Amino acid sequence: TLQRSAQTAQGVLTMKIEQVKVILTSPNQNYLFVKLITDSGVYGVGDASLNGQEHTVADFITSFLTPILIGRDPTQIEDFWQLVYRGAYWRGGNIVMSALCGVDMALWDILGKVTGQPLYRLLGGKVRDKVLCYSHVLGKTNEEKAALAASYVKERGLKVIRLRAGAPAANGTLGGGVQDGPKVE
């Protein structure tokens, strides 16, 4: 199993990060994912998207973070986080933090896989039994789109629709009418 392949006879993790892949998707709405691959074949994936700045975040990961990550123990998550956060020239800036968050997610993904534990347990335990799921209407929303979304959501047992309604006084938008629109529940 993954757990056994990542452990020595003493039960100590001995993996090293061997490869960093930056995956930029979709020409219209870019999402940026980071994939860290260890020498034992275990990999983790994280989301480093920053709307409109994905190429810059990707360059930061490739140029700055990859040399730091290669050869590192992926279970030393806090050590890596502190090194990057304290060592980055623009500490706390959007580019650095998006890149750092994506790598952080990937490292936690690896730790969850090698320990066989769900992330919620590794991060301190379960907080709730359920999570509210919702549907999203892309682009400018009109009454027809809202009605279709309401039907879609109702069929699937969801209770919330996220949409771009516009200002109440704007022509051609749902504006204030959204509050008076179809109820999904």
Q: What positions do the PLM features span?
A:
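Metal-dependent enolase-superfamily TIM-barrel catalytic cores that perform enediolate-based chemistry
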Residues: 130-185
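Solvent-exposed alpha-helices and their adjacent loops that cap or buttress functional pockets
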Residues: 26-27, 125-127, 153-154
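Glycine-rich, aromatic-flanked loop segments that form ligand/cofactor-binding clefts
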Residues: 104-140, 144
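Metal- or metallocofactor-binding catalytic centers and their adjacent structured scaffolds
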Residues: 39-114
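Short, Lys/Arg-enriched N-terminal segments with co-localized hydrophobic residues
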Residues: 1-14
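Ligand-binding pocket scaffold of soluble enzyme catalytic domains
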Residues: 26, 34, 40, 45, ...
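Structured beta-strand/loop patches that form or line metal/cofactor-binding pockets in enzymes
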Residues: 12-50
